[in-house]
A protein has these predicted regions:
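Structured alpha-helical segments in the cores of large, soluble enzyme domains
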Residues: 213-225, 239-258, 436, 467, ...
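Catalytic or ion-translocation cores adjacent to nucleophile or general acid/base/metal-coordination motifs
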Residues: 332-364, 588-775
Length: 994
C-alpha cells in the first residue's frame, strides 16, 4: 500500500498517533474549535456504564492503563493495518487514498483551522458519488468498531493483571467494596442480612437505539476472541501468525457484512435479538460473578472471629420489555407477548439441558466409593416409578453411578419440558401425562438434592463447582429467563374501563366522573367484578387489553408464577390510572376477592415521566396507598409497590436540571410515604443510554441516589445499544454486573446503619438551579419561534426514522412534529448526530450563572460538588455530554435550516448556552478543562473524535443532496443508502445513539 491509514488510540499517557506501518507520528494537536478558541478538545459522551468510567487518579486500574498504554497502541496499530489491507484488496487503493486524504485533512484542521482547507475537503466529498462514499463511510465505521474492541480487551487484560498480582483492586471491585464494609465495622451477620436484601435488576428493552445488527455483533465477538487469544502465552511456534490470520479473516468477513439492516426488524426479530446477550455472555458470566463475590467475602472476613461463611442469595435478576412494551407500538400484541415469554422459556431450558449434559460427564462418582444421602436415594426410587411413562432404557443407564443416573433423568425431564414449550409455541396439543419439569422449583430441588448429598459424603469441592454454578443460574433465571413487564399508556386503560362499564350498563359516562367517584366505583367493582358475557361486543382495543391479561394468567400457570414482572402504566397522572388496570385484571381472574380473602397475581408500576407528574407524585402515590381495596390487593401481592421514574421524557419536557432534581426529590418522597404506611417501595429507573436520557456511570449513578432510598433493590432499563456495549462479551458482562452489584451494596448500608441526611442548604440551592434551568430550557424549546423547525431541519432526525433499527415508530402520532409527540429517543439521537447535545446540558449554564452571582453560593456549590454524590454526578455527566458537542460542526448543521432568522436565533442561543455551561462547570468544579478529573476518558475521547469529523461532513453533504427539491428521485434514492450508513457510523464512533 502506498498510503497507510492512521489510527487513534485510547488510554495513552502521551498524545500520539500511530502510522499502521508501525511508525510513531506527530502528537495530536490540541483540539480547537473554529467557533470558540476556548474549547480545548472534543470527545464523545460516555455510555451508561462503559468501562472507562472507573477513573480516579489513585485507582490501580487507571495506573495500569497508563503504564501499559503502549500495548494498546500496538494492538490498534495491528488492527488498523489489517483493516487497511482488507480495504486495499476488497475495495481498491482509490478508496484507501480517499479515506487517508480526508483523515489527514481533518486532523490538520484540528491543528490549524483553515477555511480554505475546509472548503477543499468539502469539495472532495462533494465530488464523490453515493457509490464512492459508501466504502469511505464503512472504512471509518469499521475502524471505530475495531478500536473499541481493542480498548475493551485491553481493559480486561489490565484488570486481570491487577488481580493476578494481588493487593488493592479497582474502585467498584468486590474486594474494594468488602474492604469498605469491613472498615465500617459491618459484622458477618450484618453482611449476611444486607446481602439478603440486595436485588440488582436490569431490564432489557428493544428501544430503537441499537443500530448494530446481530450479525455484526457476532463478527465482533469473534474478533474480540481472536484478539484476546493473541495475548495468551504462545503454546506453539506460529501462535502469533495463526491468530493474526484469524483477525484478518474476521475483519475481511466484517467488511463483507452489511451493517445496515435491509428491512425494519419486527417484534419477533427483537425477541430473538434479546436472547443473544443471554446466550452469548450472561449464562457464563453470572456464575463467575457469584464466585468472585464469595471469594472476596472470604478474603475480607476470614480472619473475623465470628465469620463462619456466607450463604449467597440470588441477588441478580433480569427483566425484559421486549414483546411486552406496547406503548406506542401497535406491532406488540397479546400473541407477541405470549411468543416472547415462550421464547425466553425455551432459551433457558436449552441452557439447562446443555449444562446438565455437561454434569453427566463431570459427576462420575461410583456408588462403591461414595454413600449418597437417604433423601437422594429416595429420589432415585421416585425416578424409577416413571419408567413405564418415560423411557424404557433409563434404568440401564449408569446403574453404578448415582449422580449420573439422576442427571440423566433430569436431562430427559428438561427435554420433555422443552417439547411442551414448543407445542405451546406452535399451538399444538400436549399430553399432560408426560413427566417434564413443571417449573423451576422442581428442577432446583433436584439440583440442591445432589449438592447436599455430595457434601454429606465429603465431596464439597465438587459440589461447589459446576453444580453450584447451575444452581445459581437456576435461582437467577428460573424457567422464565427474564421477568417480562407489560407496558401500556394510561388512556388505553381508562378508555377500556369506560367501554366495559358502558357496555354492561354500569356507567354510561365514566369519563365525566371526578377522581373521588372513580376510585370509589373502581374499588366496588374490583371487590365484585362484573361478568362479561360477550367480549366481541367490546371495542377492539378493549378486547386486546383483556387478551393481554389473559396471556399473563395463562403463562403464569403454564411456566411460572414469576414469569411476569410488573404492569407498567406510562403517562400515569392519578391514582385511578392504577385502579383501572386492577379492575381490568379482575375481569380476567388475576385479582379479586374470594370470600373474605383478596388474591392478586399482578403488580402495577405507575410511570411518572413529565415534570408536572414528578412534581405531583407525592399526592398521587399517597392517594393510591390509602385506597382501602388497593391496600388489600397490595398485601396479597407481597406489600411491595413499584414506582417507575421516567428520565427521558422528563428531561425532554423540562430540561436536564429540573428533571434530575425532581427525580431526586420524587424518590425521597415516595420512600417516605412507603415507610409511613408500612409498604416497601421499589424504584424502577427508566434510564436511557445518553446523559440527556438519564445515562451515566452505573456504579456512581447508583451511589448518587438519595441516601436511604435504595433499600437494597434497584431496577432500571438497559436500552438499545447499551446492551451490546455491556453484554456482548462475557468478560465485559462480568465487569458490568460487578460494578452494578457493588454500587447497590455500597448504597444500601442504610439497611444496617443510620444514614446522614442531606444538607438542607444543598436542597435550597438545587431548587433554585432547577427553577432557573427549567425556565431557560423552556424559553428555548417552547417560546423561541421556529425552534422545532430548526430541530427537524438542522438535525437528521427525519432521516433517522428511515433507519431500520427498531419496530417502534419514532413519533407517538404520525405527522405530529410537536415536542410532546417526538419520542425522547429520537429527540436525543437527532441532536447527537448534529453534535448539538443540548438535551444533556441546556439550561445548566444559565442556572449556575444565576446562582453564582452570589460568591457565598459559589462556595456552597463547590462544596456540593466535592461532598454530595448527586450534584457531582450531575456535573460530571454534563461534562461528558459537553465534550461530545462540536459547535463548529453544529454550526454547519445549523446551515441546513432554511430560515435565516430562525437559524441565527436558535443556534445563537444554543452556542451561547454551551459556552456558559462550560465556563460555569469549570468554575464550580475548579478545573482548567472539562474532564480534567477523568484523564483516561479525556484522552480516549480526544483520540477518537478527529475520525468523526469526516463522517459529519459526509453526512452534511448527503443531507443536502437528499433534501434538495431539485434532486431527481433516482439520485435522492441513491443518496439514502450512504446517508443511513453515515448515521450508523457516527453512532458507532460516538458510541451513542439515543
Amino acid at each position: 500500500m502506498t498510503d497507510q491509514w492512521h489510527g487513534s488510540v485510547s488510554f495513552a499517557s502521551v498524545d500520539c498517533r500511530i502510522n499502521f506501518s508501525g511508525k510513531m507520528i506527530a502528537d495530536l494537536p490540541k483540539y480547537t474549535n473554529a467557533v470558540s478558541p476556548e474549547r480545548r478538545f472534543v470527545a464523545l459522551e460516555n455510555r451508561f456504564t462503559s468501562l472507562s468510567e472507573c477513573t480516579t487518579l489513585s485507582d490501580p486500574f487507571v495506573d495500569a492503563c497508563m503504564k501499559h498504554d503502549k500495548a494498546l497502541r500496538g494492538r490498534v496499530k495491528l488492527l488498523g493495518q489489517l483493516l487497511g489491507e482488507v480495504i486495499s484488496s476488497q475495495a481498491g487503493d482509490d478508496v484507501l487514498r480517499t479515506v487517508e486524504r480526508l483523515r489527514k485533512g481533518f486532523i490538520q484542521l484540528r491543528d490549524r483551522p483553515d477555511p480554505v482547507r475546509l472548503e477543499r475537503l468539502k469539495k472532495v466529498i462533494g465530488t464523490l458519488s453515493p457509490d464512492a462514499l459508501r466504502p469511505v463511510i464503512r472504512a471509518f465505521s469499521i475502524y471505530f468498531q475495531l478500536a473499541g474492541t481493542a480498548e475493551e480487551s485491553f481493559k480486561h487484560r489490565q484488570r486481570r493483571r491487577i488481580a493476578a498480582r494481588g493487593g488493592v483492586l479497582w474502585k467498584g471491585s468486590f474486594d474494594a467494596c468488602l474492604r469498605d464494609l469491613r472498615e465500617m465495622g459491618v459484622a458477618p451477620d450484618e453482611l449476611q442480612d444486607l446481602l439478603e436484601e440486595i436485588r440488582y435488576m436490569p431490564v432489557f428493552t428493544a428501544h430503537p437505539t441499537e443500530s448494530k445488527r446481530r450479525s455484526i455483533m457476532l463478527q465482533m465477538r469473534r474478533i474480540f476472541e481472536s484478539n484476546d487469544a493473541l495475548d495468551a502465552p504462545p503454546i506453539f511456534v506460529d501462535h502469533t501468525e495463526i491468530y493474526t490470520r484469524n483477525l484478518h479473516t474476521h475483519i475481511q468477513t466484517l467488511w463483507k457484512t452489511d451493517e445496515v439492516r435491509p428491512s425494519r426488524p419486527d417484534v419477533r426479530h427483537e425477541i430473538r435479538m434479546g436472547m443473544h446477550h443471554f446466550k452469548g455472555a450472561l449464562f457464563d458470566a453470572i456464575p463467575v460473578v457469584y464466585g468472585r463475590l464469595e471469594r472476596a467475602i472470604h478474603r475480607a472476613y476470614d480472619d473475623h472471629p465470628d465469620f463462619q461463611g456466607v450463604d449467597l442469595p440470588a441477588m441478580l435478576r433480569f427483566g425484559s420489555w421486549i414483546g411486552g412494551d406496547r406503548d406506542g407500538n401497535p406491532n406488540v400484541t397479546a400473541d407477541t407477548t405470549r411468543e416472547a415469554i415462550l421464547t425466553q422459556h425455551l432459551t433457558i431450558l436449552r441452557a439447562y439441558i446443555e449444562r446438565v449434559a455437561d454434569l453427566v460427564g463431570i459427576l462420575t462418582h461410583s456408588q462403591d466409593f461414595c454413600s449418597p444421602s437417604p433423601a437422594f436415594l429416595g429420589s432415585l426410587r421416585e425416578d424409577d416409578a416413571y419408567r413405564e411413562r418415560f423411557d424404557q432404557e433409563w434404568p440401564a443407564r449408569f446403574p453404578e453411578e448415582p449422580y449420573r443416573r439422576k442427571l440423566y433423568v433430569m436431562g430427559l425431564r428438561l427435554r420433555q419440558a422443552e417439547r411442551r414449550g414448543l407445542a405451546w409455541l406452535d399451538g399444538r396439543p400436549w399430553n399432560p401425562e408426560i413427566i417434564g419439569y413443571r417449573g423451576e422449583d422442581e428442577f432446583l430441588h433436584d439440583l440442591v438434592l445432589i449438592r447436599d448429598s455430595m457434601i454429606s459424603h465429603g465431596d464439597a469441592d465438587a459440589a461447589n463447582a459446576e453444580l453450584l454454578d447451575l444452581i445459581r443460574l437456576t435461582r437467577t433465571f428460573g424457567f422464565y429467563l427474564a421477568r417480562l413487564d407489560i407496558r401500556q399508556e394510561s388512556t388505553v386503560h381508562s378508555d377500556a374501563v369506560a367501554d366495559v362499564l358502558a357496555r354492561l350498563g354500569i356507567e354510561q359516562n365514566y369519563a365525566s366522573l371526578d377522581e373521588t367517584r372513580r376510585l370509589e366505583l373502581l374499588g366496588e367493582l374490583i371487590e365484585k367484578p362484573p361478568v362479561i358475557d360477550d367480549r366481541g361486543a367490546l371495542a377492539a382495543m378493549t378486547q386486546e387489553v383483556l387478551r393481554v391479561l389473559d396471556v399473563v394468567g395463562e403463562m403464569q400457570h403454564a411456566i411460572s408464577p414469576r414469569v411476569i414482572g410488573r404492569y407498567v402504566i406510562s403517562m400515569a397522572h392519578r391514582a385511578s390510572d392504577v385502579l383501572h388496570v386492577m379492575f381490568l385484571a379482575s375481569l380476567t381472574g388475576l385479582c379479586g376477592q374470594q370470600g373474605k380473602v383478596f388474591r392478586c397475581r399482578l403488580g402495577v408500576s405507575p410511570l411518572f415521566e413529565t415534570i408536572d407528574d414528578l412534581a405531583r407524585i407525592e399526592p398521587v402515590i399517597s392517594e393510591l396507598l390509602d385506597h382501602a381495596v388497593y391496600q388489600r390487593l397490595l398485601r396479597a401481592h407481597g406489600s411491595i409497590q413499584e414506582v417507575m421514574l421516567g428520565y427521558s421524557d422528563s428531561a425532554k419536557d423540562g430540561g436536564i436540571v429540573a428533571s434530575a432534581w425532581l427525580l431526586y426529590r420524587a424518590q425521597q418522597r415516595v420512600i417516605t410515604l412507603g415507610k409511613q404506611r408500612g409498604v416497601r417501595i421499589r424504584l424502577f429507573h427508566g434510564r436511557g443510554g445518553t446523559i440527556g436520557r438519564g445515562g451515566g456511570p452505573t456504579h456512581d449513578a447508583i451511589r448518587a441516589q438519595p441516601a436511604g432510598t435504595l433499600l437494597g433493590q434497584i431496577k432500571f432499563t438497559e436500552q438499545g445499544e447499551v446492551l451490546s456495549y455491556k453484554y456482548s462479551n462475557r468478560e465485559t458482562a462480568i465487569y458490568e454486573l460487578t460494578m452494578g452489584l457493588t454500587g447497590v451494596i455500597s448504597a444500601s448500608t442504610g439497611l444496617i446503619r443510620d444514614v446522614e441526611a442531606d444538607d438542607e442548604t444543598y436542597h435550597s440551592n438545587m431548587r433554585l438551579l432547577a427553577k432557573k434551568g427549567e425556565a431557560a430550557y423552556r424559553r428555548l424549546t417552547e417560546q423561541t419561534p421556529g425552534f422545532l423547525d430548526y430541530f427537524y431541519e438542522a438535525t437528521p432526525v427525519s432521516e433517522i426514522g428511515l433507519l431500520n433499527i427498531g419496530s417502534r415508530p419514532s413519533h407517538r402520532a404520525r405527522g405530529d412534529r410537536s415536542k410532546s409527540s417526538v419520542r425522547a429517543i429520537a429527540w436525543v439521537f437527532g441532536w447527537a448526530q448534529a453534535r448539538q447535545t443540548l438535551p444533556a446540558w441546556y439550561g445548566l449554564g444559565t442556572a449556575l450563572e444565576g446562582c453564582c452571582s452570589n460568591k457565598q453560593r459559589l462556595k456552597t456549590l463547590r462544596r456540593m460538588y466535592r461532598d454530595w454524590p448527586f450534584f457531582r454526578a450531575l456535573l460530571d455527566n454534563t461534562q461528558m455530554a459537553l465534550v461530545k458537542s462540536r459547535m463548529d460542526i453544529a454550526g454547519e448543521y445549523a446551515e441546513l435550516c432554511s430560515d435565516e432568522q430562525i437559524r441565527e436565533t436558535v443556534f445563537g442561543l444554543i452556542e451561547e448556552e454551551y459556552r456558559r455551561t462550560e465556563k460555569w462547570i469549570r468554575k464550580v468544579a475548579r478545573i482548567d478543562e472539562l474532564l480534567d478529573e477523568n484523564p483516561l476518558l479525556k484522552t480516549s475521547l480526544r483520540r477518537r473524535d478527529p475520525y468523526l469529523d469526516p463522517l459529519n461532513h459526509i453526512q452534511l453533504e448527503l443531507l443536502q443532496r437528499y433534501r434538495n427539491p431539485e434532486t431527481r428521485d433516482v439520485d435522492r434514492e441513491a443518496s439514502l443508502d450512504p446517508l443511513l450508513r453515515s448515521i450508523n457510523a457516527i453512532a458507532g464512533g460516538m458510541r451513542n445513539t439515543g
